[in-house]
Amino acid sequence: MTQRSIAGPICNLKFVTLLVALSSELPFLGAGVQLQDNGYNGLLIAINPQVPENQNLISNIKEMITEASFYLFNATKRRVFFRNIKILIPATWKANNNSKIKQESYEKANVIVTDWYGAHGDDPYTLQYRGCGKEGKYIHFTPNFLLNDNLTAGYGSRGRVFVHEWAHLRWGVFDEYNNDKPFYINGQNQIKVTRCSSDITGIFVCEKGPCPQENCIISKLFKEGCTFIYNSTQNATASIMFMQSLSSVVEFCNASTHNQEAPNLQNQMCSLRSAWDVITDSADFHHSFPMNGTELPPPPTFSLVQAGDKVVCLVLDVSSKMAEADRLLQLQQAAEFYLMQIVEIHTFVGIASFDSKGEIRAQLHQINSNDDRKLLVSYLPTTVSAKTDISICSGLKKGFEVVEKLNGKAYGSVMILVTSGDDKLLGNCLPTVLSSGSTIHSIALGSSAAPNLEELSRLTGGLKFFVPDISNSNSMIDAFSRISSGTGDIFQQHIQLESTGENVKPHHQLKNTVTVDNTVGNDTMFLVTWQASGPPEIILFDPDGRKYYTNNFITNLTFRTASLWIPGTAKPGHWTYTLNNTHHSLQALKVTVTSRASNSAVPPATVEAFVERDSLHFPHPVMIYANVKQGFYPILNATVTATVEPETGDPVTLRLLDDGAGADVIKNDGIYSRYFFSFAANGRYSLKVHVNHSPSISTPAHSIPGSHAMYVPGYTANGNIQMNAPRKSVGRNEEERKWGFSRVSSGGSFSVLGVPAGPHPDVFPPCKIIDLEAVKVEEELTLSWTAPGEDFDQGQATSYEIRMSKSLQNIQDDFNNAILVNTSKRNPQQAGIREIFTFSPQISTNGPEHQPNGETHESHRIYVAIRAMDRNSLQSAVSNIAQAPLFIPPNSDPVPARDYLILKGVLTAMGLIGIICLIIVVTHHTLSRKKRADKKENGTKLL
């Protein structure tokens, strides 16, 4: 065993021990929302810089969370409440003695407050991109939702809405309503409303008012325009995930109240489990118990934090390791690019370096012009030292000294740490790092970088990157491109349009086209880098055919970069570049193109790449995601490709999909996903995503994705229908996309351990089928689903196993003993292809079916599930359970449900009351006429 392999585990053990010792600090330093003693600490709510200043927003947020805390406490049976909340005030608002931020930023917020950019909707929603029981990304409220009290009529009180969304975000449960399928036929052949619980009552309403249920039915389906209006007064106490606006609703659907037959997303995504079952299975509930007594918890405490000056320090490794594999050259090129193009104006920037000791190279300098940028570039290192040992802690110490010169503390500052060496004493400065209030972004170069380097980023909420020693990799520049101010102001941040590199032979060329769409174009820059002594021949064509040559670029021969800034707004369209290698040997030529938004009212299309977990153990796959959107609207049908670079070996490319199958949970939400499991060896992997958008194919969605709080159109109260104001349109105007667009984003890095050396047996099964659907046509049942692969969502599975039952509980609890459907003639197709399979279920489902409890009842529904098998007999998990009505004779109409019987009784009673009232009125009128006649007659007699 080598000295390094012995020292590594010892160092890691010391590092872990130190982390445990400092664990009390973690809830407040980069660890996100933590549950301690039944209370949530660290919830971060951030207001976007584009939101106009309004102090009522802050007071309403406080009221919302305070109400939500008590509502959540009771709904979870005295389990959890909100204790400490931070509200991040944008720097664009006036400073009111708010605390200075530490590691908080808009991009890390659990809740964001911002408009939808051009839309008029106010739906609160949570972006969920993972499966059942998994945390979401963020909750989104519009300022209007938080300020306009009229909206509470449709959504319910803001505190109740927040609890609905919190359950999405924290516990990964889904909505129990379905606007697309508001009605269904249950197992007793009754027409039911999609809801949870089934005890919630109301009446059917046609386009012109109340109507009998049968007027809503055409061919046993509900007529378009027929809806169900809920009673404002209910006895049902569930469910928060259905209609939190009802005053009686105070809990989540549990095993006794959950409606397993309703065609909603909760049933589909969570295999018919109740919301409460999923919630109680969460880590929060495994580590907490109900509070004793009857007292309520204390109300939440709020702290307002606000960003000040943006402060960045580059902390750069200059040890002898940086001389290997052109690492210093790559660092110089990327750092120059960052200083000249990426870092935002008015930012304070300093530079420190380190080998075995630290050194300050440049004190803080505010960027107000290009001259300021050039001055900072001049301080970048040009040589490496002869020292092989490094001290990352010494470098960080100098970095803190630099940033503390401004305000005496490092609060809110950013460190960009770049290193290729191992530091076994890295844990020594961990307390200083944790207490600094600084965010550390780490960039590891090559395979010898400190194995614990990423912990600095993880604990401070920073990003993690890896740059392999591959000559044509552009990962270093991609990493610096990904690092933004974190303010959430997309109009001030750069957008990466292109990033590519190739090893080009002598007298050969690198040629490609990049699209500048009409949402970007300001501050557009083309960057070319090379390895040889002189630049390649550069030819660039704009969309009008104008040519730019090498002499039009600003060249830095020391760093081997050539940059071209397009004045004003770059012309939209296709820009074509050609790089000719005029050198006598092969060299890596690379191109990077960035731009900024061209219109402050129109957000640019963006892509954010990330992984589900950044550290895992073989054979667990990596889930790769790319969120492609414009503003908050998803962009559909784009071509999204992930490139994964290992420490050793060739890069792997993978097409990401938004098809609602395999790794992709929700179809057409703009989040493209895929499993990655092609692990070459243990170590770090770098991720980058390319997006290409064809105007003839790709389209922006017309609605915001995510799990939305239900907007109730109206209620019935005392026999009267009271309609709410129509829900505002959440659609968007279609914009001309003549050229499409291209985008690039680094997804950071991830690491994998436990990868076997050499060939290993197949350990990857087909992925779970999550989109099984069943449709009954006459006497046949047609199933459809997306084909899984031989390995997860790639390749081709070997066989399918389809089973069915008339008992939901049977197929849910005992799939292996449900009725087997003959699929011998059905061979799986390639992963991603839509499968369709039709069969007749009658021969196996005649007569009543015995239930697990020994009872029997006649069921009019069939439940079906499926799993796939690969050639090595590895099985997927059982799919979601699909359901459909059995064959119903023509004279067997659906039985009116209780809601209709209630309505019929009400209408009958109202009719009887009306008849009685009519009799009374007629009798009264007759008697009155008779009295008047008698008086007239008596008067005549007196005269």
From Swiss-Prot:
Effect of N637Q: No change in size
Coiled-coil region: none
Membrane-topology annotation of the record: Single-pass type I membrane protein
GO terms of molecular function: chloride channel activity; intracellularly calcium-gated chloride channel activity; metal ion binding; metalloendopeptidase activity
Protein location: Cell membrane; Basal cell membrane; Cell junction
Tissue spec. comment: Expressed in cornea, skin, vagina, esophagus, and larynx (at protein level). Expressed in trachea and mammary gland. Weakly expressed in testis and kidney. Highly expressed in corneal epithelium, colon and trachea. Moderately expressed in brain, urogenital organs, bladder, uterus and prostate. Highly expressed in tissues containing stratified epithelium including cornea, esophagus, larynx, skin and vagina than those tissues which contain only epithelial monolayers. Expressed in normal breast epithelium but not in breast cancer. Highly expressed during epithelial stratification.
Family matches, as CDD domains: vWFA (cd00198)
Domain VWFA, first and last residues per copy: 311-483
BP GO annotations: cell adhesion; monoatomic ion transmembrane transport; proteolysis
Residues that bind Zn(2+): H164, H168, D175
Enzyme active site: E165
Post-translational events: The 141 kDa mature form is autoproteolytically cleaved by the metalloprotease domain, producing a 109 kDa form and a 35 kDa form. The cleavage is necessary for calcium-activated chloride channel (CaCC) activation activity. N-glycosylated.
Glycosylation sites per record: N74, N150, N231, N522, N822
Pfam families assigned to the protein according to its UniProt record, in alphabetical order: CLCA
Main location class: membrane
This protein's name: Calcium-activated chloride channel regulator 2
Organism of origin: Homo sapiens (Human)
Organism lineage string: Eukaryota, Metazoa, Chordata, Craniata, Vertebrata
Gene: CLCA2
